Every structure is written in structure tokens, then in C-alpha cells.
């Protein structure tokens, strides 16, 4: 018996309505369904509630209704287990989702029949090291961001690849993005768009103090480290928009490829550059 997990953005009425329809369709097909506890409450099905944990790693597919933010958070839960994720857009941009909510039921039937592709997307991990000790490791699909607090002035950051210092930034912060994240915050900060199949990481300063500061593209498997050289105030590390982990002067953030990937469900005919044109230019 196939088993699916369903996550919805409960704040979006369209996600709730479409979620109810998809749940009915899945159960009618004979599949077992797990619901995130919040979704179970919103859909009135507490009998299907399953807290995040090992059970989520045993499903055949995770179906997500919401925008890119909802999908990214869901990916973080199941990527270590290799679970495919199907995103259905009920938000605004929906750059990472596979289909729009209005097409969901018809397209879902194709997916349930096995007519889909799996796209592997690189993820990264950022580890905070203080006095030689690893304090925290944060996974991300889009990016890891070191940034100053709301009342702090510029932070001084030193970027190294291996034993070589490649950049020193006086800026509001720095973004380390995957190719997937190249169309997110990094793009807004002036970074390039990178095709998802390229094996690399992008280092982009945020509002640097000098015009000569530019993005750097490095290999995905290099030893990339960012040291907080000095900070006159608060500075923190966030991953995919998470709450920041506080950093101190002298802390080092080591960023590299995660030992797992995000597995995104795609419909036949998916092309990255078609999506890029449609989502970013509206044509």
C-alpha cells in the first residue's frame, strides 16, 4: 500500500481547500496518509496526525501545499531520508513547486500513476565553530546567511577557501547559496542565476561598503569558511530564513555540501529555464 504525507500552509485558504480534495483523492485510491499535526487539526482528521520523526522517513512521497517557504521547511524534514517532495503552489511565486493549485487534482492523478521525474537538488550544511568546538549545524536548500542585527553596524567577515583568504567584506552580511538558492536572496543581493545542475556554492556580500566587492562562485566540495573578524553589535547565522544562531567575533562558519539531497518531484516536460522566464519575468 502506498503511503503519503501531506503538509499544508494552514494560513492559506486555497491550501486548505485543495488539501481536503487531495486527501479525499489519496484515500479513495487506497493509499495510507499521514498529516502534519497542524494540518490534521485544520482538516478535521486528528486520526491521521503524525508528529515529525522517523515515520515521515517511511512515506513514498511528501505532498506540500503552500509557497516556496512551506516547501523548503518540508524538504528539511525529509531530505535526510531521501523522500521525494511534490510541491503544489498556493502562494505567490512558487518557484520550486511542481504545479499550481488549480491543476492539482488532474496532475496528481498523473503522479499517482507514476508519470513524474525526480530532480536531485544539492543542499548545504553550515556549522558554527567556536574555540575549536562545533556548536550547531544547520541544513539549507537555498542559503545560509550571516547578517548583522537590526541595531548593529557593519560586520567584518573573512572568507577562506582551504588555507587561502579569498575575500574580506565590510558589509551587512554575506549569503552562501546553493544553485537552487541563486534565484532567492542571493539574486536580490546581486548574485548570478546558476542552473541547478551546476556543482557550486555562491558567496554574495549583502550591501558591501566597497564597490569592488562581488559574488564569488566556488566548488561545492571546497573547504569554505567564513570568520567573523569583528562586529560592533549583534550578528547571527540563519539557514533558509530560520531564527538566527548568535555569533561572536572569532567564530567560524564552515559551509559545505550536505551528505543528502532534496528530491523534488517534476512533471514530464519540466525545464528550468522555462520556469526561470515565467516566474521572474512573468512571460
From Swiss-Prot:
Highest rank taxon of the organism: Bacteria
Keyword tRNA-binding: no
Pfam families in alphabetical order: NAD_kinase, NAD_kinase_C
E.C. code: 2.7.1.23
Enzyme type, top EC level: transferase
Catalytic activity: NAD(+) + ATP = ADP + NADP(+) + H(+)
PANTHER family linked: NAD KINASE
Family, similarity comment: Belongs to the NAD kinase family.
Protein name: NAD kinase
Annotated organism of origin: Symbiobacterium thermophilum (strain DSM 24528 / JCM 14929 / IAM 14863 / T)
Organism phylogeny: Bacteria, Bacillati, Bacillota, Clostridia, Eubacteriales
Gene from which the chain derives: nadK
